[in-house]
Each structure stands twice: as C-alpha cells, then as structure tokens.
Amino acid sequence: MAIHYETKATNVGGRKGHVYTDDRALDIDIVPPAQADGKATNPEQLFAAGYASCFNGAFDLILKQNKVRDAHPEVTLTVRLEDDPDSESPKLSVSIDATIKNVISQEEAEKYLQMAHEFCPYSKATQGNINVDLNVNVVD
C-alpha cells in the first residue's frame, strides 16, 4: 500500500502542554477547552480544523469530478465533547455544515456531500466511531 503523506506531531504536557509538528509549521500551546484564551488551542479545535480542511477538499474534488463549477464550497465543522452514557470518559460528535453557491439543486448538493463524506480520509477514520451530522445549504 502506497503512503501518500506522513507527518508527525509531538505533545508534551497533555491538555495543559505544548504541541508541535516535526517541521514546526504548527508550534502552539494546548489548554483544556474551558481555559481557552485565544493564545492557545485544544485538541478539539485542531481536530475541527483538520477535518474541515480535509472534508472541504474532498467536497470540492467531488463537485469538480461531477462537472460542477463555481460552487465555491465552504465547510464549517463543529466538534462537540459530550457525555458518553456507555463510559466515564466523554466522546466526540461532529456536525459538518457546508455551503455552496446556487449552481446545483439542494438534492444534488446533498448527494455530492454524501459522496465527499465517503471519500474524505477523516470521515473514513471516524466511520462508526463518532456521530456525524451532514448538512448542506445552497445559497445565492
């Protein structure tokens, strides 16, 4: 199996620590969500940023493969840390909210959003592990 890309991130101190990538493109303090101060981040924000970027790339690709031009997709991904009734530790859930320009119907947009969900590596990694809500809004 061919590896398309590999990266490394190192954390020291857990949720009250620091994380950096091997190339130092990301080099930031980590704090628990309740202590967010705008100068540090948390694992949930990093997950949301990565998943939103990956998913929007997949959505844009699916649209282009299906000859949909000028859709200008935008994806907002909400990550929730919530109680897990089956465990003492919390669990994640995700909402993916996409917006595209009014170049296709709502029905087509929903179909392509689902295709992107099946294609996106983050979606594949989380499949069956977390609840994911998909929403798309076609706007003028």
Swiss-Prot record:
Pfam families: OsmC. Gene3D superfamilies: 2.20.25.10, 3.30.300.20. GO terms for biological process: response to oxidative stress. Belongs to the OsmC/Ohr family. This is Organic hydroperoxide resistance protein-like. It comes from Staphylococcus aureus (strain MRSA252).
